[in-house]
Amino acid sequence: MIYAVFFEERAAKELARIDKPYQLLIKKKIEQLTENFDSMVNNLKPLKGKYDYYRLRVGSYRVIFHKDSRKIIISIVRIGHRKSIYKDFD
């Protein structure tokens, strides 16, 4: 099942601030995620206290997203370094 991807405005800005090599790697991982969600389970972890929110690990960076299985949509909520990504995520 192929998911559609939607970047929230904040996530798009955060991605633009990351160095180009990591941007390309993050985009590649997101593409793999949309094409075959089940094959990425080793890099995914559900967020505690947040239903249908997950984090995707890409090196030192994390991609936080919401998966809507009914509409087959993945909404990218936040992208950032692992040290700071969770600080103001609510």
Name the predicted role of every residue range.
Residues M1-K29:
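Arg/Lys-rich, positively charged N-terminal/basic patches that mediate binding to nucleic acids
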Residues I2-A4, E9, K13, V58, ...:
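Enriched for short, Lys/Arg-rich terminal
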Residues K29-Q32, R82:
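Conserved short hydrophobic interaction patches
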Residues E31-L56:
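A short, surface-exposed loop/turn module that caps and links secondary-structure elements
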Residues V63:
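NAD-dependent ADP-ribosyltransferases
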